[in-house]
Swiss-Prot record:
Source taxonomy: Eukaryota, Viridiplantae, Streptophyta, Embryophyta, Tracheophyta
Listed InterPro entries: ALMT (IPR020966)
Source superkingdom: Eukaryota
Function: Malate-sensitive anion transporter permeable to chloride, nitrate, sulfate and malate. Involved in dark-, CO(2)-, abscisic acid- and water-deficient-induced stomatal closure. Belongs to the R-type anion channels.
The name this protein goes by in its record: Aluminum-activated malate transporter 12
GO annotation (BP), single: stomatal movement
Family of the protein in this entry: Belongs to the aromatic acid exporter (TC 2.A.85) family.
Miscellaneous field: Malate functions as a gating modifier as well as a permeating substrate.
Tissue expr: Expressed in roots, stems, leaves, flowers and pollen. Mainly detected in the roots vascular stele and in the leaves guard cells.
Recorded phenotype for the gene knockout or disruption: Impaired stomatal closure resulting in a wilty phenotype.
Organism: Arabidopsis thaliana (Mouse-ear cress)
Keyword entries, A-Z: Cell membrane, Chloride, Ion channel, Ion transport, Membrane, Sulfate transport, Transmembrane, Transmembrane helix, Transport
GO cellular component terms listed in the entry, alphabetical order: endomembrane system; plasma membrane
One Pfam family it belongs to: ALMT
Length: 560
């Protein structure tokens, strides 16, 4: 009896705890809502301004309903103005212009075409009029839908074609039953014009948000982010002690993440920037497509940074004692690349051409020093130079194997196989011991591993026997185990140097791709009419920037 009471009390406690958890969990989420709302506005204060602009626009357009004189003039069709404000008013001025003009042109063309259809079908009978309207709806609908597949129309006027189809069908089909269809089209056009006018006023004149400026800032931020990623990657690779892994977001990944994910954002911002009027003091045309090209080149450059980051996460790593031999030229080479990226970011940010000495002699000196450092350690990358001794030992082991095989030919088939296997193992051990002695005599000694060839040969022989037994039993499916990381390292004499060779080659590839980035940025400055580089005014700023390029913060505009 006591056991039953005890079990019942436990179940009751579990039920109460679950109920308490179900009650407290929503309350905890509700408490986090104000903080999340605050963070949304803190990340980009322009979001708060946009929300206030939308609220004010809806209030103004609602006056068409609230004020009696305006309502009498427009009537119930004023709801189209409210719908226009909700649909058209976007975050940036370019997006609002794109949607507003598309909606206005679509409505105007659809109304004109519907009026023409009504004028032609007015004199025909009721049946012929229905057939004519149905045929017109079919042809116009099919043609407009097919036009939407054209890439240029899809990119720039897709929303306008949708509004055209909607307005044309509403007016044309309703004209068969309603006589005052022209008045309906007239009222709808005016209400949509009022809504679009309010949206354009709010977007262009009240704290305007330009897509071109957002594209400009994101390009600067991507250059700065790549610079920080490269610097952090090289610093972490040459750290003396291994860094403990944390759950926080990787600082290296944060730098190049925006570059890899920027394709759709750049194209959208460039599309909206193409609709925006010239609003700068010089009134130059905004080179939106050139910004897209710069973004594409930066993504190609970013892939190299991703591969460089991958060198830090490989399973087989070069010992830190070996990395230290090449630390100085690699750090200087990466520093020069970071300086160049920071200079490009500053030139775009300040609307000026970059320095003519952006690729300084220090970069070429760092490349030459890295090349000399690698050449100074040939045994590290090419293995031992004493190939003649290896050949002698190999020839001796092969001759010994043949001699033992001839002597043991009369011992039987199985015994002959075992003796030849043992001789092969003995010869292989001699080669391994000779290679280890040569590694000790080299300039740089790597941590050596002893290849257990006998175990490998025994494994192969047992694998054949087990495979034959399983095939006899009818079980033919078997997964062959793969070699471990140690087996891979023992199979290559210079396997420890391969990760660093990949790291160094990626640094050199980064320098090669830097030329493409500089060319596109210079082309951007030429098209956008950037001001010329002033050596006297910018010399001090360049010296300060080049010392610590990683402290520059990214300012990326929001885009919708």
């Amino acid at each position: 009896m006591s056991n039953k009471v005890h079990v019942g009390s436990l179940e009751m406690e579990e039920g109460l705890s679950k109920t308490k958890w179900m009650v407290l969990e929503p309350s905890e989420k509700i408490k986090k809502i104000p903080k999340r709302l605050w963070n949304v506005g803190k990340e980009d204060p322009r979001r708060v301004i946009h929300a206030l602009k939308v609220g004010l626009s809806l209030t103004l357009v609602s006056l068409l309903y609230l004020m009696e004189p305006l309502f009498k003039g427009i009537g119930s069709n004023a709801i189209w103005a409210v719908m226009t404000v909700v649909v058209v008013l976007e975050f940036s001025a370019g997006a609002t212009l794109c949607k507003g003009l598309n909606r206005g042109l679509g409505t105007l063309i659809a109304g004109s075409l519907a009026f023409f259809i009504e004028f032609v079908a007015n004199d025909s009978g009721k049946v012929l009029r229905a057939i004519f309207i149905g045929t017109a709806v079919f042809i116009i609908g099919a043609a407009a839908t097919y036009i939407r597949f054209i890439p240029y129309i899809k990119k720039n006027y897709d929303y306008g074609v949708v509004i055209f189809l909607l307005t044309f069908n509403l007016i044309t089909v309703s004209s068969y039953r309603v006589d005052s269809v022209i008045n309906i089209a007239h009222d709808r056009f005016y209400t949509i014009a009022v809504g679009c006018g309010i949206c354009l006023f709010m977007s262009l004149l009240v704290f305007p948000i330009w897509s071109g400026e957002d594209l400009h800032k994101t390009t600067v931020g991507k250059l700065q982010g790549l610079s920080r990623s490269i610097e952090a990657c090289v610093d972490e690779y040459f750290e003396e002690k291994e860094k403990e892994k944390t759950d926080s977001k990787d600082r290296i990944y944060e730098g190049y993440q925006a570059v890899l994910d920027s394709k759709s954002t750049d194209e959208t911002l460039a599309l909206y920037a193409n609709w925006e009027p010239r609003h700068t003091l010089r009134c130059h045309r905004f080179p939106c497509q050139q910004y897209v090209k710069v973004g594409a080149v930066l993504r190609q450059f970013g892939y190299t940074v991703v591969a460089l980051h991958g060198c830090l996460q490989t399973e087989i790593q070069t010992p830190r004692s070996v990395r230290a031999l090449f630390k100085d030229p690699c750090v200087r080479l990466a520093g020069e690349v970071c300086k160049a990226l920071t200079e490009l970011a500053d030139s775009i940010s300040n609307h000026r051409h970059c320095s003519p000495e952006i690729l300084s002699d220090h970069l070429h000196v760092a490349l030459q020093d890295l090349n000399s450092a690698i050449k100074s350690q040939p045994k590290l990358f090419l293995g031992s130079n004493l190939h003649r001794h290896n050949n002698k030992h190999q020839n001796g082991s092969i001759s010994n194997n043949k001699h033992h095989q001839r002597n043991s030919s009369n011992s039987g088939k199985d015994l002959n196989g075992d003796v030849s296997l043992q001789n092969t193992e003995t010869g292989t051990r001699k080669i391994t011991e000779t290679g280890s002695r040569q590694g000790q005599n080299g300039a740089v000694s790597l941590s050596s591993f002893r290849t257990d060839t006998s175990a490998l040969m025994e494994y192969r022989r047992s694998f054949k026997n087990s495979n034959s037994e399983m095939s006899a039993a009818g079980e033919r499916r078997m997964l062959r185990p793969q070699l471990s990381k140690i087996a891979v390292m023992t199979s290559l004499e210079f396997s420890e140097a391969l990760p660093f060779a990949a790291f160094a080659s990626l640094l050199v590839e980064m320098v090669a791709r830097l030329d493409n980035v500089i060319e596109e940025v210079e082309e951007l400055g030429r098209i956008a009419s950037f001001k010329e580089y002033d050596n006297k005014r910018d010399q001090t700023a360049d010296d300060v920037r080049c010392e610590n390029p990683a402290n520059v913060t990214i300012s990326v505009g929001a885009a919708e």
